Amino acid sequence: QTYLKEVKKTSISIDKTQNKVIEGNQNNLIQNLKYEVRLDQENQYIITSDLSEITYENDIEIVKMQKVTAIFIDGKNIPLTITSDKAIYNNSNYNTNFSDNIQIEYLNNVILSDKMDLDFNNNVINIFGNVQYDGIQGSVKTDNIKINLITKKIDIYMDKDKNNVEIITKK
């Protein structure tokens, strides 16, 4: 008698690469950590750091990163590159809070700020704290820039209504 058994293969893809684990702490310290996340068919998010500490809050992996580079690639394959001194990355929803010396580059545009939140739950980027934008058309100083990742709509506004956004055009 011959019995046939159907075997199903399950493929598991690991998103994070790590080069060196530093011992001696209850939390895991990792050098050169990299996460690659395919958000959907068209959008990809890659984040790397020189040094990271992995902790767990309510069974969710939270990664405190130092010397961070993140790249968000949309359907048009145009990268939005973010660098910062620090970031906190949530591995369950990929939301990332960047802080200290943030530089955002997209096409020929550069934004500098103190803080930035990349919120995939609401598909929005919030840039705040000493925001300075420099592009081909000119430069802007403001308190906040909000970018909708779906519609690409950009809101530029101040914390207080009595303050004005400063715009300098290039001629």
Describe each model-derived feature in a short phrase.
Residues 1-171:
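Mature-chain termini and adjacent capping regions
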